[in-house]
Amino acid sequence: MPRPGSAQRWAAVAGRWGCRLLALLLLVPGPGGASEITFELPDNAKQCFYEDIAQGTKCTLEFQVITGGHYDVDCRLEDPDGKVLYKEMKKQYDSFTFTASKNGTYKFCFSNEFSTFTHKTVYFDFQVGEDPPLFPSENRVSALTQMESACVSIHEALKSVIDYQTHFRLREAQGRSRAEDLNTRVAYWSVGEALILLVVSIGQVFLLKSFFSDKRTTTTRVGS
């Protein structure tokens, strides 16, 4: 016969390990209502994306230019009837939240048509609707168990960690791009200075040589 209290201890251990296992499963990405894409936008180009959204759905569009030029891009969002919901010119990053007023296909475009020479790398995150509940009982009046409440808290914390990591990666990529661009400019400037110094040195050598060169004088006899 098991000793008194052993069942409670085993239940507590099982609960802790079950919560840990569920936390590990939450780390695996699953289906959701968000689309994250990083794409190349050439110069004089425009790229559009389309999303079917139901009426009353809350959506958020967030974008950031990672590399290229002045790190800016034009963004435009339209509803199914072509009405402009959001429009910004030459923005480095921004976020816009709206609620779909009707069913249909919504379009959002990124434009680099104002740039003639530089292409851009653009990241955007388009979130449609709310995440589904972790447990079916979340939508009911009944209270969650202690394990379910802990797992929900872990799930929310993990989502915050993922958001922070995404923003940190974007900042790191943008900072690396700026550093590489600055390094290239410094290298070109150093090569230019070296060439100028070489030309000046050669000019000085020829100038000094002309000062010490022998000048032959010619004499003319005048006959009487």
From Swiss-Prot:
Lumenal side: 35-187
Cytoplasmic topological segments: 209-224
Annotated glycosylation sites: 103
Motif (COPII vesicle coat-binding): 211-212
Location of the protein in the cell: Endoplasmic reticulum membrane; Golgi apparatus, cis-Golgi network membrane; Endoplasmic reticulum-Golgi intermediate compartment membrane; Cytoplasmic vesicle, COPI-coated vesicle membrane
PROSITE patterns reported for this sequence: GOLD
Post-translational modification remark: N-linked glycosylated in complex form containing terminal sialic acid.
Signal peptide (from-to): 1-34
Pfam family, one: EMP24_GP25L
Record membrane topology: Single-pass type I membrane protein
A GO-annotated cellular component: COPI vesicle coat
Classification via InterPro entries: Emp24-like, GOLD_dom, GOLD_dom_sf
Domain GOLD: 46-128
Entry function: Potential role in vesicular protein trafficking, mainly in the early secretory pathway. Appears to play a role in the biosynthesis of secreted cargo including processing and post-translational modifications.
Assembly, per entry: Predominantly monomeric and to lesser extent homodimeric in endoplasmic reticulum, endoplasmic reticulum-Golgi intermediate compartment and cis-Golgi network. Oligomerizes with other members of the EMP24/GP25L family such as TMED2, TMED9 and TMED10. Interacts (via C-terminus) with COPG1; the interaction involves dimeric TMED7.
Full protein name: Transmembrane emp24 domain-containing protein 7
UniProt organism field: Homo sapiens
